[in-house]
Curated annotation (Swiss-Prot):
Record flagged with keyword Nucleus: yes
Function in brief: Essential negative regulator of type I and type II interferon (IFN) signaling, as well as that of other cytokines, including IL2, IL4, IL6 and leukemia inhibitory factor (LIF). Downregulates cytokine signaling by inhibiting the JAK/STAT signaling pathway. Acts by binding to JAK proteins and to IFNGR1 and inhibiting their kinase activity. In vitro, suppresses Tec protein-tyrosine activity. Regulates IFN-gamma (IFNG)-mediated sensory neuron survival.
Recorded metabolic or biological pathway in which this protein acts: Protein modification; protein ubiquitination
CC per GO annotation: cytoplasmic vesicle; cytosol; nucleoplasm
Source organism (scientific name): Mus musculus (Mouse)
Protein's name according to its UniProt entry: Suppressor of cytokine signaling 1
């Protein structure tokens, strides 16, 4: 009896605790109340770019746009285009190379697309490549060219040999690239269409018709 009365006493609810239990809201009543709708927060407005806030200036004509687009595609295929390489990075890569070694990279100047970095006798230097009136020329030179690679070929073949061999990202070139270069050098890019080849090989030759 004593044990049973003790258990009953332990399980009994004290009068002081009863009002507290009655005052606590039940979970069923709180869950039945409708939830407040979630309103999406408005996205902050993105400010429009100010005129001239890009790296390159606006193209003057659609022909200029096509020429730069074509030049970019040729640069991607040439192997010595180093993209957004800095001036310091370009000079460090050229420092131990022979005189005349060069590479093409993006210019950091707002009014130029590309820059030419070359190892001179006095050390590496960089020259801006200007694009004006649909033609390319080096900074400080009056000689202009329809194509950036014609400009490079001109300075490679010049008597003073300002440019030598390009610094390629891959030192070992694929055999098909070497064959294409020799064919272009042998017959000239103006005669590539006359070579009796299937369309696939002819397209490959014309995809980079330069001797560099």
């Amino acid at each position: 009896m004593v044990a049973r009365n003790q258990v009953a006493a332990d399980n009994a609810i004290s009068p002081a605790a009863e009002p507290r239990r009655r005052s606590e809201p039940s979970s069923s009543s709180s869950s039945s109340s409708p939830a407040a709708p979630v309103r999406p927060r408005p996205c902050p407005a993105v400010p429009a770019p100010a005129p001239g806030d890009t790296h390159f200036r606006t193209f003057r004509s659609h022909s200029d746009y096509r020429r730069i687009t074509r030049t970019s595609a040729l640069l991607d295929a040439c192997g010595f285009y180093w993209g957004p390489l800095s001036v310091h990075g370009a000079h460090e890569r050229l420092r131990a190379e022979p005189v005349g070694t060069f590479l093409v990279r993006d210019s950091r100047q707002r009014n130029c697309f590309f820059a030419l970095s070359v190892k001179m006798a006095s050390g590496p230097t960089s020259i801006r490549v200007h694009f004006q009136a649909g033609r390319f020329h080096l900074d400080g030179s009056r000689e202009t060219f329809d194509c950036l690679f014609e400009l490079l070929e001109h300075y490679v073949a010049a008597p003073r040999r300002m440019l030598g061999a390009p610094l390629r990202q891959r030192r070992v070139r694929p055999l098909q690239e070497l064959c294409r270069q020799r064919i272009v050098a042998a017959v000239g890019r103006e005669n590539l269409a006359r070579i009796p080849l299937n369309p696939v090989l002819r397209d490959y030759l014309s995809s980079f018709p330069f001797q560099i």
